[in-house]
């Protein structure tokens, strides 16, 4: 429950809206439960995307798309979120960014070539000329991860492997304990407050107990 509470507070602070934060949190919990990534990976990616300026309603869908690519190429999800977010804040693609995508095995140049109706070797010239904006990169990511795309549905497919199922079971257990903790939050908080009082006032409590004896 503690981990969930921290995430809930973090999203409420970032969004300034409890309802939006709760909606996003429920989406992320479900995504973690049906993909090979754990809740912490998914939540960290969500926080990064929000910090880069992604709207709350688009965060989970974007994470799923980036997660499909990350799962397909066995690269860290947050690494790809960083690269995507950096391109978004720059509002265009630079040569070094294209190289970073390509270096990770992401066929971005191929997708951009299709978009612009040019050969792959001409994409670099378009990037250098500043003609490839973030919307084009976003469209390329969507094309790669739509149903039937190169990476479409890979996270869900990987979640059916033994490793993926173990990760999903761990997330399900965390979710179960969170629900139990939420239902008993008042009791737990009172218990913790009582324990804190005992620790902070152990000398006073000790004297009282000695007097009783």
Describe these PLM feature segments.
Residues 1-3, 135, 203-213:
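Gly/Ala-rich hydrophobic membrane-inserting helices
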